[in-house]
Design a protein with these regions (language model features):
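Conserved beta-strands of PAS-like sensory domains
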Residues: 111-145, 150-154, 189
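Short N-terminal helix-loop-first-beta-strand/juxtamembrane motif that initiates sensory/input modules
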Residues: 61-75, 141-157
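Active-site core of bacterial EAL-family cyclic-dinucleotide phosphodiesterase domains
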Residues: 230-257
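Cytoplasm-proximal transmembrane signaling helix
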Residues: 197-233
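Short, hydrophobic beta-strand elements of compact beta-sandwich sensory domains
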Residues: 124-134, 175-202
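Juxtamembrane extracytoplasmic/periplasmic/luminal helical "stalk" adjacent to the first N-terminal
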Residues: 1-49
């Protein structure tokens, strides 16, 4: 059972790691859409922001399935967006760290929902692409039991539920997978070393098989040892085990009756 448990633990670790890579690949695809959208915004930034340019930005955001809005800022001021009237869904323009990614908490948005921001900056122009929390949570939703995947950007994290949180000190999710394309990490909890549920769920069939093999081996060994024993040994063993109670016939002298 101990050996089977260790094997199932290694198997669970491999599954959790594969799930984290799958989630990271999902986030990479979303950010690839954001990167492509910024190229359209770069071309528009060199023109005027009129209805045609806004229509192009809106079309670009609509055709990318995971994007919400595209915002062009010049000298820190909103210059053009993909929404009518140059509206934005941000209550304030956040300050980005050195990375081009930022997790914005619900307090920074108009609809009070957290978002992921992708930034592209050149000269005095900044292009922001917003990605909704639903798409991020959908990318983190890997159908594996017992594991929870969380997106980490710098010191901020967002999971399948809840708002953006800042890491302070120790966090129980010690396993991680880094993206090779963008500055984010998928962190997740390791599988427990021993899990009775995992042993039953994944190893029940193996346990039954081991039990059947053990019973068959015991039966064959018993048949082998009993077959090689002499009749006298079999009789003596049966008497010692109480399986046979000997009956002693008294000896009678024929002449004396």
């Amino acid at each position: 059972v101990a050996i089977l448990n260790i094997q199932l633990w290694y198997s669970a670790k491999a599954e959790y790691l594969a799930g984290a890579r799958y989630a990271a690949n999902n986030i990479n695809h979303i950010l690839e859409e954001a990167s492509q959208a910024t190229q359209t915004a770069v071309n528009i930034a060199g023109k005027e922001c009129d209805l045609e340019e806004q229509y192009q930005l809106g079309t670009e955001a609509a055709l990318k399935p995971h994007l919400r809005t595209i915002i062009i800022l010049k000298q820190g001021i909103v210059w053009c967006t993909s929404l009518p009237g140059n509206r934005v869904l941000l209550s304030r323009i956040p300050v980005f760290p050195d990375s081009n990614l930022l997790l914005a908490p619900a307090i920074d948005t108009v609809n009070r929902l957290p978002i992921l921001l992708y930034q592209n900056q050149f000269a005095d122009t900044r292009i922001l692409v917003t990605i909704s929390d639903q798409h991020i949570r959908g990318a983190l939703n890997v159908p594996l039991k017992g594991v929870r995947y969380v997106l980490r950007v710098a010191d901020d994290i967002i999971g399948p539920t809840g708002d953006v949180m800042t890491l302070n000190g120790h966090y129980p999710y010690t396993e991680k997978v880094h993206s090779t394309k963008y500055h984010f990490t998928i962190i997740f909890n390791p599988p427990p070393l021993f899990s009775f549920y995992r042993l039953i769920d994944k190893g029940f069939g193996i346990l039954i098989f081991i039990l059947l093999i053990a019973c068959a081996a015991a039966f064959l060994l018993d048949r082998y040892f009993n077959k090689s024993a002499t009749p006298e040994e079999i009789l003596r063993r049966a008497i010692n085990n109480g399986e046979i109670v000997p009956f002693y016939q008294p000896v009678v002298n024929g002449r004396e009756g």
